[in-house]
Amino acid sequence: MFNLFLTDTVWYVGQIIFIVAVCLMVTIIVVAFLASIKRCIQLCGLCNTLLLSPSIYLYNRSKQLYKYYNEEVRPPPLEVDDNIIQTL
């Protein structure tokens, strides 16, 4: 009939455990790699949110304030009398 020894059975079980362990390790490594890529993408988005967007906002706002100051707040330049300049 069947001539299965205990050592053969242990060897087969050991092979199955080894294959399952290798598959688990590969799965863990792949998941860790994908998670690190996800973190990198999140950090790039965070960099955009914390650095780039406020800089663009400050640039546009300061440009608006500069135009407003030059057009409405700043007093007109004083006219200089030519006689005063000639006497100097």
UniProtKB/Swiss-Prot annotation:
GO biological process: one example: disruption of cellular anatomical structure in another organism
One Pfam family per UniProt: CoV_E
Membrane topology (Virion surface): 1-16
Intravirion topological segments: 38-79
Compartment annotation: Host Golgi apparatus membrane
InterPro entries xref list: E_protein_bCoV, E_protein_CoV
Main location: host cell
Transmembrane annotation, as ranges: 17-37
Keyword Cell division belongs to the record: no
Topological relation to the membrane, as annotated: Single-pass type III membrane protein
SS bond list: none
CC per GO annotation: host cell Golgi membrane; membrane
Keywords annotated in UniProt: Apoptosis, Host Golgi apparatus, Host membrane, Membrane, Transmembrane, Transmembrane helix
Complex formation: Homopentamer. Interacts with membrane protein M in the budding compartment of the host cell, which is located between endoplasmic reticulum and the Golgi complex. Interacts with Nucleoprotein.
Family to which the UniProt record says this protein belongs: Belongs to the betacoronaviruses E protein family.
Described purpose of this protein according to its UniProt entry: Plays a central role in virus morphogenesis and assembly. Acts as a viroporin and self-assembles in host membranes forming pentameric protein-lipid pores that allow ion transport. Also plays a role in the induction of apoptosis.
UniProt-recorded name of the protein: Envelope small membrane protein
